[in-house]
């Protein structure tokens, strides 16, 4: 309403196969595949014009004081593309076999989740690279990986259309169910001190390294929502 009142034109570009203002998901999968196979756009960075902005906040001396944490995965598009190619050519060969193993999956999974979340690389770029690589073999593992890229967009699409799930149970039978929350238990969960070894190991791992594979992330969230909330 505020944008309309100020006569501001809002331009929003579709990304990662999620469709805004979709009435239902009946044909969503078909639309998703169409979007994933569409040509990638040329960014034409050389045509961009820089903004001249004088400030003393970004001095070279300041950046020299910054240091990277060796435990944390590096960011940026260049590193994201390198991680993608390493996964497709090498690590994906053990993808399905090791996907449920908390430790081994740290290398056999794509390690692209953080890059996708931060916008270092698009799902369409990842999809097309993995799809083309299937012709070189390893089809079963790469197909499984491609299906999980669709899952990523599916869950965001679901939240796009059912925003109330952030506050209300998906199963309406639980709407009137009231359970007290123990905030101390939740704080202990946040620190990895629940006393349950696998849950605590997963939480401490993600706090230290910034990464946890899909199934271990699901474990942490499931424990929180089913046992503590």
Model-derived regions: residue spans:
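Active-site "lid/cap" and pocket-lining segments within catalytic core domains
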Residues: 1-146, 156
């Amino acid at each position: 309403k505020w944008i309309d009142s100020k006569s501001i034109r809002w331009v929003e570009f579709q990304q990662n196969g999620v469709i805004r203002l979709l009435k239902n998901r009946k044909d969503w999968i078909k639309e998703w595949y169409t979007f994933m196979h569409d040509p990638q756009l040329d960014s034409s960075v050389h045509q961009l014009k820089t903004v001249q902005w004088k400030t003393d906040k970004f001095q070279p001396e300041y950046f020299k004081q910054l240091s990277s944490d060796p435990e944390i995965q590096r960011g940026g598009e260049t590193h994201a593309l390198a991680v993608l190619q390493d996964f497709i050519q090498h690590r994906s060969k053990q993808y399905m076999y090791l996907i449920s193993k908390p430790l081994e999956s740290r290398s056999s999974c794509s390690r692209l989740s953080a890059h996708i979340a931060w916008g270092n690389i698009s799902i369409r770029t990842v999809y097309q690279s993995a799809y083309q690589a299937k012709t070189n073999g390893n089809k079963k593992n790469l197909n499984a990986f491609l299906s999980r890229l669709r899952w990523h967009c599916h869950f965001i699409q679901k939240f796009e259309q059912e925003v109330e799930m952030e506050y209300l149970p998906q199963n309406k039978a639980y709407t009137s169910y009231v359970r007290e929350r123990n905030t101390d238990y939740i704080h202990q969960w946040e620190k990895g001190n629940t006393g349950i070894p696998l849950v605590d190991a997963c939480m401490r791992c993600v706090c230290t390294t910034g990464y946890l594979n899909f199934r271990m992330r699901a474990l942490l969230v499931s424990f929180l929502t089913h046992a503590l909330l």
